[in-house]
Amino acid sequence: IREQQDNIIAIDNLRAVTISPLVESELEARFIEALKRMGKSLENFECRPEFKGTKAGWFIRSGEHRYFMEPQVDLNAEHGVSIFSRADFVLWPLVNKAAKPIVIFTDGFQYHKDRVDRDSAQRLAIVASGEFLVWSLSYDDVQNVLESKSVEPLDLFFGMPKEKRQPFLTKFQSLELLELQNQSSFQYLVNWLH
């Protein structure tokens, strides 16, 4: 303690102490908790802290798939990304090396409402690299999992009458979209991982 006394910082209370240096926001911490909770409803799902080399993150096992989820990843020209971006998380596939890593952003309205154009440009640059998939989750996406709320899913068919959906999807060999129509963005992500 004496050797480090010049580095000691006074704080008002313990709430001022960051619990995990791996996440930069409360929403990111909630995302981890929501991922663990949603995973409990699945067979063969695990999310636990782990080191990969010198990097701290989480090991995720979902069915036969394995991922290392790394927080706070800078994506730039080295990754083929033309506009610098700092991803909240990247899920790096460990088993299926042909699978693209999934870049995850957790976007709370308070911090992103004035930068939608910038966020969109960054994410489009990540997609344009051809190296990654991009997933965005809102505060509500995460909070609904934590509160076990069912959500009104997006209308993937833009008002198309139900009786026309199956023939339409059959024509384009996309029947699996029928299963997705009643899921939230968070559920899509977990199912994608599984």
Q: Where do the PLM segments sit?
A:
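Solvent-exposed, charged helical/coil patches
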Residues: 1-68, 180-183, 187-190, 194
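Basic, glycine-rich
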Residues: 98-102, 128-194
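Well-ordered, non-membrane alpha-helical segments in soluble/globular domains
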Residues: 26-33, 116-121, 151
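Short acidic, S/G/P-rich loop/turn micro-motifs used as interaction or catalytic elements
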Residues: 109-113, 141-144
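Mg2+/Mn2+-dependent nuclease catalytic core
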Residues: 113-129
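Short helix-loop-beta junction
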Residues: 36-43, 124-132
